[in-house]
Amino acid sequence: MTNSSITAPVTDILAKARSGANLSAKEAIILLETTDNRLIAWIRETADFLRRQQTGDTVTYVINRNINFSNICEQHCSFCAFRRDEDEEGAFWLNLEEIIAKAADAVRRGATEICMQGGLNPKAKIKGNSLDYYLEIVKNLKQAFPDLHLHAFSPQEVQFIAREDGLSYEKVIASLQEAGVNSLPGTAAEVLVDEVRRVICPEKIDAATWLEIVGTAHRLGLHTTSTMLCGHIETPSQQVQHLEKIRKQQEIALENNYPAKITEFILLPFVGQSAPKPLRNRVGQDQPILADTLKLTAVARIYLGNSIKNHQPSWVKLGLQGATEALNWGCNDLGGTLMEEHITTMAGALGGTCLTVEELATAIKSLDRPARQRDTIY
């Protein structure tokens, strides 16, 4: 294949994207499979152009705290170094007082958001009810800190509660919302292709269930985020299938005028350093490959940007320097201060667990772009 025969389709695709049109899945795959550095530079420039057009030059961040309330989990995802059995060394399960104390510390430090998720612990019940356990945490947090935005419980956790108690997803989500949950994290998405999920997270909900729960949340008025775990066994085609499903889910929310939608897309590159050996050995790397992550970051902006405008890198996984570079590849948000983080750190990530507002603002300023604190839903 000649150089010009490779260049022509890529430039045509990028011109189409710049015109404001949505790309097809096939066109996105062509971009991801591009290896010519000159063309990759054009992909970056197009993503940066669209980012500027769709969200402006301001880079946002949120002052938040992660609270991972337990790592006791019934599942055994092949990428996860966080989960433990109840009697295993390193297992933890925070009580209500400890959770409230962490939230109080976060509020003292200026946090507007608590992001809360945990392992799937069948013993986390009150009088035999899983939902009641989660509701007790939420009600006590909101009673103590009514103005705090509670971004809590992934679609996987919603399904777990529903299964344990024999409830519908709608009942679980509505109950959490009524108790004070303000939005759901779009984690546990990993790759929304069941062929991949059967290898990396066979016990997790399938792609259709993840999408159903997210759609139900939107219909009930709860915003969600969206994520993708990349850089392991998935192919470019499977990456695009994932993006396509997220875009379609957002289009459903927009076309039906649901009261809520997907607020952001976050790319989460696989960190293998301390991950279980089978997947770590199969992937053959301990830390993310920055160049691959940046190219996918750009293609995600180009493919999703018309419907999901806010794109965020993971500084925990890429480090602050890598995440700052992603702001040149289509991202417009640098995420949160976190204050603590266990899931990725236990997998061996080198990005750290806490950044100050000053550190985030300095990183943004290094690009000569203005910084602005935001709330959870932008």
From Swiss-Prot:
The keyword Iron-sulfur applies. GO terms for molecular function: 4 iron, 4 sulfur cluster binding; 5-amino-6-(D-ribitylamino)uracil--L-tyrosine 4-hydroxyphenyl transferase activity; 7,8-didemethyl-8-hydroxy-5-deazariboflavin synthase activity; iron ion binding. Keywords: 4Fe-4S, Iron, Iron-sulfur, Metal-binding, S-adenosyl-L-methionine, Transferase. Its EC number is 2.5.1.147. Binds 1 [4Fe-4S] cluster. The cluster is coordinated with 3 cysteines and an exchangeable S-adenosyl-L-methionine. Pathway: Cofactor biosynthesis; coenzyme F0 biosynthesis. It is an enzyme of class 2 (transferase). [4Fe-4S] cluster binds at residues 73, 77, 80. InterPro entries: Aldolase_TIM, CofH/MnqC-like_C, CofH_family, F420, FO_synthase_su2, rSAM. Its cofactor is [4Fe-4S] cluster. It catalyses: 5-amino-6-(D-ribitylamino)uracil + L-tyrosine + S-adenosyl-L-methionine = 5-amino-5-(4-hydroxybenzyl)-6-(D-ribitylimino)-5,6-dihydrouracil + 2-iminoacetate + 5'-deoxyadenosine + L-methionine + H(+). It comes from the Bacteria. Residues 59-306 form the Radical SAM core domain. Consists of two subunits, CofG and CofH. Belongs to the radical SAM superfamily. CofH family. Catalyzes the radical-mediated synthesis of 5-amino-5-(4-hydroxybenzyl)-6-(D-ribitylimino)-5,6-dihydrouracil from 5-amino-6-(D-ribitylamino)uracil and L-tyrosine. This is 5-amino-6-(D-ribitylamino)uracil--L-tyrosine 4-hydroxyphenyl transferase.
